[in-house]
Structures are given as structure tokens and as C-alpha cells.
Amino acid sequence: MAEENRQNFLHGAAILAAGVVVIKILGAIYKIPLRNIIGETGYGYFFAAYTIYNFFLTISTAGLPVALSRMISEANTLGRPCQARRTFRVAMVTLGVLGLVFTLLMLLFPTEMAIAFVSKATVSRCVFAISPSVLLVCLTSAFRGYIQGNGNMKPTTVGQVVEVLVKVVVGLALAIWFTRMGKSVPVSAAGAIFGVSVGSLAALLYMLWSYLKEYRGPAALKCAASDDVPDSVGRTLWRFVRIGVPITLGASVMSLFSLIDTKLINMQLPHVPGIGPALADELYGAYSTMTTLYNLPAAFITPMSIAVVPAISAAAVRRARGEVGSITESSLRISAVIAMPMGAGLAVLAGPIVELMFRDSNAAGPVILTYLGIASVFVCISLVSNAILQADGKETLPIISMLAGGAVKIACNLLLVSRPEIHILGAAIGTIACYAVICILNCIFISRNMKVSIRYGKAFLPPLVSSAVMAACAWAVYGLAARLLHVGQSGRIMLAAALVAAIGIAVAVYLVMVIVTRSVTLEDMKLIPKGQKIAKLLHIR
């Protein structure tokens, strides 16, 4: 049973991760040309509005779908199909009401929100355009939480691909159309962000279809054939809220700090000596653009943070603490193996990456990405460690760590952004400090409060060494290739060739180092689809 649960966990994570690869490719197709169409200033407007949207979305969907997934998993483990059905219905109504309230607020008061949250009235059109997404995503997340609680990750993956595909097509089409018509930058940015709303609608329709096709009928039949008497609506709602609200508060802490981060940057930068309002908009746009790449490693880790919830919850219900510890250590180790090389690669190859992907970027862009590449490693580990604590019923502990990290982030902004020699880089430095604090505290909480034995040195040190060697090789190979190909004189094609060569060698070196340092164990490989064949191919013992 324990081995089956661990297999299901990593199989689910693998399905979600495969979808993430497609989603990230589509996302790059969307955001990279989008930034080049509407410019860094326009992308700054887009990003600022998205930050406001993300705050309301986090309040609505960060914790409650996790609670739903956990409660459905527990009900299924205990053989209570009627309780699972009631939990889903309660969750759907609750999420729908929350989504409707926040959507109406954004529709009716876009200018007030733009000024209050990010100190930019020019963002109001973007806020209005993205507002329907809150309601649509709330409803979608109810279906996702229910289906994931049943151990099926495929509909979530397909739904996300549908969402991003529609967003790409609609968003880019509107951005190009408005730009060619000579519309202002705020209007073009609003057209681009409206694609998010249309994509959210497409995802909702797909998840509704999946639920009706695969779950509605069988769930009703299971309930009818069972003698399970579900808990009252009030009791179900209370437990749903009791589990979900602490998780929501924890996630909302970081979303709120992101809003404060955005507001502080936009308040401080224009008044820094030698910058002024126009350059401040450009610098914030560069910072926003770099976050597109900085978020890439976290996107590959998010599937694991989703899949770990029902796996640990089911083990905890059976009081299988050894299994909880095993899943916890595996998830932390695998997240480090994935996140560390990606973060290191972004850091050492920031210059050529920015030059290739974003034409005419501000000179601060590569330096920002170097810092954010380092920060991305801590972000990934914090995502997984938060999910581990939440899945084991320790929902309040991540709130403490995120409050501490957020406070450090604000302090760094206040101290560093206003300094002329640092300015926008202060925000990136603060991000490193913020998530490093969260990771350290979460690891302490896992060891002390979950009563499991985790070998952190074995989980983190081998991939750290492997990533350091890989990063050094990537830096050296790119430098050599750039000289041989005369990158500075030959244009973007030679730049791309040098970058591909560096990345290719880096990947090969990292795979060798993973084997040499035993960053991944044979036990880990057995838990992923085709893992034993891969382990045999890579000589992992």
C-alpha cells in the first residue's frame, strides 16, 4: 500500500510535469513576443495588473482547492463516497461566491485598485480586462481539486494546456491588432491580458466536460450503493474552511507582499537620483520581464507540490509516519535536482539569454536575472516544503515562515531600492533573502513538527555540487563558443548557436554529475514512470 501510494504520487507529478513542459513552451511563445510587441513599459503595466489579479486569485483559490483535494483523498481512503460528493458541492458553491465577489470588485473599481495597489492609474484598463478570470478560475479550481483528490492529474494538465493555448492566440492577436491600429500602450497591454480571461473560460469548459464525462455518474452510483452518511453541510463547510483558510492565509501573505513589493518599487524608483518617472517605468518593466524566466523553474516544481498533497494526506490518515517521511525526503531531493541546475543556468547565462530573447532590454535586465536565478532555487524548495507541511495538517507553520520571509523582502526594498547604485537590483536581492528565510524555517518545521527524519545533507548537497560544476562548464563553454563564432559581430543566429552549445554541454555534464554524486537514488528512480529503465541506462545503482 505504501509503495503504491508513493508510485501514484510521483506518477501524478510526472503527468503534471509533462504538461508543464508544453505549457512553458506556449507561455514563452506568449510572453517573449508580447514583451517585444508592447515594449518593456507595456509589459510592466501587464505585470502590475497581473499582480493585482493574482492577489485576489490567491485569496480565492490558493488554499481551498488544496483543502478540497485533501478532503476528497481522505474520504476515498476511508471509503466515504457520499462525503466526497458533498465536499465537492460545498467547495463549488464557496469558490463560486468568492470568485464572483472579487470579479465584481475589479470590474467596478479598476482605477481605484490600480492606484491603491500599484500606484499606477495607467494599469486600470488591464485590471478591468483580466477581472472575469477570477470567477472563471475559482470554478475551474473546484473541478481540479476534486479530480486531483481522486488521484487523476491528467485533466488538470490538459486543461492547463488548453488555457495557455487560447491565451496565447487571443492575447497576441489583440496585442498586435491594437498596436497596429496605433492604440496607446495601456490599451495594447489590456488587449494582451484579456487573453488570460478567454483562456480561463476555455479551461473551465474543458474541466466541466471532464467532470461530467468521468465523475458525475460514477460518483452518484457509488454514493447510492454505499451506506455512507455524509456529514452535514455546516460541518463539511467548517472543515473545508478550517483546512483551507490557513493555507490561503499563507499563500496570501506572499501575494500581499508581492503587491507591497510592486507598490514600493513604483513609489521609490521615480525619486531615485538620476532615474525619474520614464526610466523608472522601463526598469520596472525590465524587472517584470525577467520574472518571466525566473518563474520557469518553479513551474516545473509546482506539479510535485500538487501531487504531494493527496499522497502525504493518505499516508497520514493511515498513521504511516515512515511513509510520510519517505515521500517528504524524495520530494525535497527531486525538487533540488530539478531546481538547482535551472537556477544556476539562469544565473551564469543571464547575459546571452536576455540578449537573445528580449531585444533592446534595459542594461539592468541580465543582472536582475542573475540574482533571480539564484532566488528561483529557494522558491522551488519553499513551494514543495509548504505543500508538505500543509498536507500533513501543519497549515499554520508555512504562514509563520512566509511572514518572516515577506518582512525581510520589504526591509530589503526599503533599504536598497532607494540607493542610486543599487535601485531595481534591491528588489531582486530582497527576493533571494525572502525565500532563503522561508526555506530554512520550513525545513526546521518539517524536522521538529512532523516527527520525521529527513537527511537534508543527502537531499541538497549532491545536486548543489552537481549544479556548481555544471554552471562552471556552461559559463566556460559559452565564453569559448562566443569567441569562436564572433558573437558580438555575427548577430542573433551565432548568439543562439553559442547558447545552445553551452546549454547542451551543461546538460550532459549535469547528468554525469548526478550519477557521480548519487543525487538521485535507485529508489527514487523506481517511483517514476520508466524509472528503472532510465536508471539502468544511466547506471544509477
Residue ranges of model-derived segments:
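N-terminal membrane topogenesis motif
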Residues: 1-26, 82, 86, 227-254, ...
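Signature of the first transmembrane helix
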Residues: 8-66, 96, 103, 107, ...
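Interfacial/gating helices of multi-pass transporter permease domains
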Residues: 35-55, 185-190, 235-243, 266-294, ...
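Helix-loop junctions and terminal segments of transmembrane helices
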Residues: 62-77, 290, 298-319
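Interfacial segments at transmembrane-helix termini and the short loops linking adjacent helices
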Residues: 111-130, 281, 347-376, 489-490
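Membrane-interface junctions at transmembrane-helix termini in multi-pass inner-membrane proteins
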Residues: 136-159, 374-404
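C-terminal transmembrane helix end/exit motif
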Residues: 173-179, 198-229, 432-483, 508-526
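Membrane-proximal transmembrane or re-entrant/amphipathic helices at the cytosolic face
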Residues: 478-541
